[in-house]
């Protein structure tokens, strides 16, 4: 199917619908449910692993192991690798069995390590149990590119009817959707066992949901450099005379919209997974994403407010989560963004990046940003200017303030920095230096590893500085870092023990053990 923009509905096969419902309801009386989804014919597979699940004491059920591309950078070039992914839904308790099919199994780890999942190993097979939803990486013999990503999601509770006139429904199977403009008041449902080749444009509308358990991808039949059909609303001036950005190939574009939910699907993008601009009241929950090419970001937020990103798994070949001011046709401040309960894996660039883009003639403020309960599995970025698992790099006269990082666990990254806070002037992206960074609080930030480079904290000049920066209960390889820590000579800077360089124009930096008198940054 060539480039088309249209609305339509796919009917779910009645037999598959019945099978899914039967699997789900069979355990409802006992509070135990297990839903597995047959893969559509023609879906890409990977035979590195054999994966099975069961309710305790019942027969094993096979999971299809999909092939997904992840990015290994070799000599500064993107080199996609064939990784594995499987998914299912459950409630109660489930047993998982994974067999490695590519030789002897010498060692295995299941990440995030904070979950402390200790499998039973017998030969080339491992077993473990889950009692709550988890997004996992199962790595045999230290292999991080040919690993298994296993997504154990909660059972769906709000699956819409295929006959609902306000639903665009993709049942199990392969679908070539093209570019779909989603009307306001519409639910797009991608069922488990579905693979949808296309992109969804949510532009100048309200009350839209894109939900399900299936896979959204773009096959490459349409060249990435070509311009897709332009959403009508996106090319019309807004009341402020601005236009959007619908001439891209992001799988999910949310712009100038309100009350949008993205929930449960898996995305294999060709550019950004989600591009969000000038939108508000947006919730992204239980989204999973893999990418392996240049500029294949995860979720990028421009000039938006009241956004919740929760329980996502992002493994991308560029920034996992990026929060910006002005770029392209998006203008205005960014505020009240929360990222929580998530797993981030940056094969290139940053797990978290704040700042960079803005509007120097009309400076933007990025404020009230929260990052809570996050596992960072990796950063691998050879360019020093783009290192930092947690980065606030303000340019273009941006002011970033009132930012909180809490309960962030960083595992042993391959190449990068723990934090990078700079008021900067990056001539590749900026036309002016940043405005400043104020009131940033890191609480319970931990790093376990030996490969992180020196972190950097630096202002630009006396009027473009970093002010009021607190690290509370910072731990490096289990050691608590604070201003009065035992064994620190008085003439040493505390930052020396945190492997941080603190440059000029940084005021109010402190490392504390706990803070009973104040638990978050003071707001202006």
Residue positions per predicted region:
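Bacterial N-terminal signal peptides that target proteins for export
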Residues: 2-16
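Bacterial N-terminal signal peptides
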Residues: 13-26
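Extracellular/periplasmic carbohydrate-active domains that bind, remodel
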Residues: 29-524
């Amino acid at each position: 199917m060539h480039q088309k923009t249209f609305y339509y509905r796919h009917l779910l096969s009645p037999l598959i619908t019945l099978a899914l419902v039967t699997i789900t309801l069979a355990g409802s009386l006992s509070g135990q449910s297990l839903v597995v989804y047959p893969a559509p014919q023609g879906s890409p597979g990977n035979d590195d692993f054999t994966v099975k699940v069961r309710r305790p004491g019942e027969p094993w059920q096979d999971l299809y192991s999909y092939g997904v591309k992840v990015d290994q950078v070799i000599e500064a070039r993107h080199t996609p690798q064939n990784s594995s992914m499987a998914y299912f839904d459950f409630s109660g308790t489930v047993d998982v069995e994974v067999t490695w099919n590519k030789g002897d199994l010498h060692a295995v780890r299941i990440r995030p390590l904070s979950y402390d999942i200790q499998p039973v190993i017998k030969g080339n097979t491992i077993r473990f149990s889950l009692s709550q939803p988890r997004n996992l990486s199962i790595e045999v013999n230290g292999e991080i590119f040919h690993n298994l990503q296993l997504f154990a999601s909660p059972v769906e509770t709000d699956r819409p009817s295929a006959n609902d006139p306000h639903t665009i429904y993709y049942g199990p199977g392969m679908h070539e959707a093209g570019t779909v403009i989603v009307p306001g008041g519409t639910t797009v449902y991608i069922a488990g066992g579905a693979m949808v080749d296309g992109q969804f444009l949510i532009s100048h509308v309200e009350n839209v949901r894109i939900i399900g358990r299936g896979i959204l991808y773009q096959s490459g039949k349409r060249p990435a450099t070509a311009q897709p059909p332009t959403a009508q609303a996106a090319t019309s001036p807004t009341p402020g005379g601005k236009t959007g950005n619908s001439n891209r190939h992001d799988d999910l574009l949310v712009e100038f919209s309100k009350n949008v939910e993205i929930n449960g699907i898996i995305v294999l993008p060709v550019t950004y997974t989600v591009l969000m601009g000038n939108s508000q009241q947006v919730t992204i929950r239980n989204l999973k994403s893999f990418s392996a090419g240049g500029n294949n970001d995860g979720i990028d937020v421009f000039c938006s407010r009241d956004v919740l990103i929760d329980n996502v798994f992002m493994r991308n070949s560029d920034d996992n989560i990026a929060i910006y001011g002005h770029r392209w046709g998006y203008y205005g401040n960014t505020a009240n963004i929360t990222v929580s309960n998530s797993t981030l894996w940056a094969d290139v660039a940053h797990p978290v990046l704040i700042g960079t883009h803005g509007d120097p003639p009309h400076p933007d403020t990025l404020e009230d940003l929260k990052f809570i309960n996050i596992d960072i599995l990796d950063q691998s970025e050879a360019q020093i200017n783009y290192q930092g698992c947690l980065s606030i790099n303000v340019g273009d006269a941006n002011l970033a303030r009132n930012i909180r990082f809490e309960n962030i666990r960083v595992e042993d990254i391959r190449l990068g920095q723990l934090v990078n806070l700079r008021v900067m002037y990056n001539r590749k992206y900026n036309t002016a230096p940043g405005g400043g960074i104020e009131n940033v609080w890191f609480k319970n930030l931990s790093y376990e590893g030996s490969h992180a480079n020196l972190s950097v904290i630096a202002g630009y000049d006396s009027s473009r500085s970093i002010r009021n920066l607190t690290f509370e209960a910072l731990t490096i390889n289990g050691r608590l870092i604070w201003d009065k820590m035992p064994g620190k000579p008085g003439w040493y800077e505390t930052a020396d023990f945190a492997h941080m360089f603190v440059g000029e124009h940084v005021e109010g930096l402190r490392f504390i053990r706990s803070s009973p008198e104040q638990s978050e940054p003071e707001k202006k």
